[in-house]
């Protein structure tokens, strides 16, 4: 039987075919995750996240149809603080707009969970999954289910007896980071099943690439705090913040550590500064990879990652200067996911393909 060798890993034609099919499934999940995060971003930017006040995992898929059903949903929304404080003049038609955003976000979440579960069952029944990756593939639908639970936990922070007019920024950040962890995991798995013509990089390059992924995730976390606190609406100037390098009020909250999570000014300041640190780290990484494995695909990817980080920072600046319109906010959020995905692909590629275990 003909065989194919990948980084000293020998594959039969059937194994190669199975890996490609699993990759297509994983990339489908990845694209759906991208869509969910972007719809979630639009849901947040349009103030739609609290429009559905109940969690019905099964029959919640069916939206209101009759006028009475719509009135019932609207009445439930009228009981929460967001309506009482911000939207007392909202009409039923205006409510329908925010309802559809949240409904679409939830239905997409259920759909990606279904795709993940059914795909896993299909590949398992047809014996296409190699033993050494079965548990990792099983983890995908589990992570997606957990993300759904975290999503409801986030929404619940703005319901009931809460006096919040939006969800908790802490829970929003956790929800986004959990989504990013799903994206990281799926990307890492799919790239591990790819074909590589170049040998793996040394341990130093591999570890550095992994740390870069972590730093990008930290920057996304601070971006989520910016979103949750609406911190992009303040100090819409660059490179200075209201004409200052260190603006007044950075440490106004007591205790001091609270400023880094609840002070909009401080959170935006940290998000800005960490982006500069991230770029410098990416440049050092590119130089290190070029020195370790000169003129290799690893080095080329590291350079391209630097370019992507600069482009993402530029997008962030434009978004800030325009006071975060929905379109630019979504483009900036989508750009962050693209940078994250590419960094994970780069990290996984430095390791080579998964070994075959019969």
From Swiss-Prot:
GO terms for biological process: heme A biosynthetic process. GO terms for molecular function: metal ion binding; oxidoreductase activity, acting on NAD(P)H, heme protein as acceptor. Its EC number is 1.17.99.9. Pathway: Porphyrin-containing compound metabolism; heme A biosynthesis; heme A from heme O: step 1/1. InterPro entries: COX15/CtaA_fam, HemeA_Synthase_type2. Keywords: Cell membrane, Heme biosynthesis, Iron, Membrane, Metal-binding, Oxidoreductase, Transmembrane, Transmembrane helix. Its main location: membrane. It is an enzyme of class 1 (oxidoreductase). The chain crosses the membrane at residues 22-42, 107-127, 133-153, 172-192, 208-228, 269-289, 302-322, 324-344. One of its GO terms (cellular component) is plasma membrane. Heme binds at residues 271, 332. Its cofactor is heme b. It is found in: Cell membrane. It catalyses: Fe(II)-heme o + 2 A + H2O = Fe(II)-heme a + 2 AH2. It is a multi-pass membrane protein. Belongs to the COX15/CtaA family. Type 2 subfamily. Interacts with CtaB. Catalyzes the conversion of heme O to heme A by two successive hydroxylations of the methyl group at C8. The first hydroxylation forms heme I, the second hydroxylation results in an unstable dihydroxymethyl group, which spontaneously dehydrates, resulting in the formyl group of heme A. This is Heme A synthase. It comes from Bartonella bacilliformis (strain ATCC 35685 / KC583 / Herrer 020/F12,63). The lineage of its organism: Bacteria, Pseudomonadati, Pseudomonadota, Alphaproteobacteria, Hyphomicrobiales.
């Amino acid at each position: 039987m003909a065989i194919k060798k990948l980084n000293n890993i020998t594959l039969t034609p059937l194994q190669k075919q199975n890996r490609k099919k699993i990759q297509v499934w994983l990339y489908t999940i990845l694209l759906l995750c991208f869509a969910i995060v972007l719809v979630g971003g639009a849901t947040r930017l349009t103030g739609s996240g609290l429009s559905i006040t109940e969690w019905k995992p099964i029959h919640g898929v069916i939206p209101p149809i009759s006028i009475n059903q719509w009135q019932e949903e609207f009445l439930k929304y009228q009981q929460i603080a967001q309506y009482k404080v911000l939207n007392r003049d909202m009409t039923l038609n205006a409510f329908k707009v925010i309802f559809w955003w949240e409904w679409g976000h939830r239905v997409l979440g259920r759909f990606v969970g279904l795709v993940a579960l059914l795909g896993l069952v299909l590949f398992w029944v047809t014996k296409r999954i190699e033993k050494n990756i079965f548990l990792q593939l099983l983890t995908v639908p589990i992570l997606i289910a957990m993300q759904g639970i975290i999503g409801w936990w986030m929404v619940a922070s703005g319901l009931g007896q809460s006096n919040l007019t939006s969800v908790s920024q802490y829970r929003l950040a956790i929800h986004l980071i959990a989504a990013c962890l799903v994206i990281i995991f799926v990307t890492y798995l799919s790239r591990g099943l790819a074909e590589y013509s170049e040998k793996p990089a040394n341990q130093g390059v591999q570890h550095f690439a992994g740390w870069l992924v972590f730093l990008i995730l930290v920057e996304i976390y601070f971006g989520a705090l910016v979103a949750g606190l609406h911190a992009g609406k303040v100090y819409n100037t660059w490179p200075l913040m209201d004409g200052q390098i260190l603006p007044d009020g950075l440490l106004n909250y007591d205790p001091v550590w609270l400023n880094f999570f609840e002070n909009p000014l401080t959170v935006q300041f940290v998000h800005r500064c960490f982006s500069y640190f991230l770029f410098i780290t990416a440049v050092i990484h590119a130089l290190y990879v070029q020195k370790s494995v000169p003129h290799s695909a690893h080095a080329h990817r590291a350079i391209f990652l630097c370019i992507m980080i600069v482009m993402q920072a530029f997008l962030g600046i434009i978004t800030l200067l325009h006071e975060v319109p929905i379109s630019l906010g979504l483009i900036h959020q989508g750009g962050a996911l693209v940078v994250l995905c590419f960094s994970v692909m780069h990290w996984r590629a430095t390791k080579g393909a998964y070994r075959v275990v019969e």
